[in-house]
């Protein structure tokens, strides 16, 4: 499961704007804003998948909730390139 705070954190980690993420994912800026909103994510699962794929392709790894909570980090694969 991807959480809205993970999307915001991944975008910030990469230094991307909501417009950048929209362009990378092929979605609109309002859709990205809904995905990052507080509370329940108000974007479709397809939109979340597209955003996540775009952020992962840009060098972020999503960390599953494993007792310590969900998170994001820079991917080792991208960090060395």
Predicted regions and their residues:
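Short basic helix-loop element that most often maps to the first helix and adjoining turn
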Residues: 7-20, 76-79
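Recognition helix of helix-turn-helix/homeodomain-like DNA-binding domains
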Residues: 26-43
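Helix-turn-helix/homeodomain-like alpha-helical modules used for DNA recognition
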Residues: 60-81
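DNA major-groove recognition helix of helix-turn-helix/homeodomain DNA-binding modules
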Residues: 26, 45-62
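Short polybasic/polar patches that bind polyanions
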Residues: 12, 23, 56
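DNA-binding alpha-helical recognition surfaces that contact promoter or target DNA
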Residues: 9, 23, 34
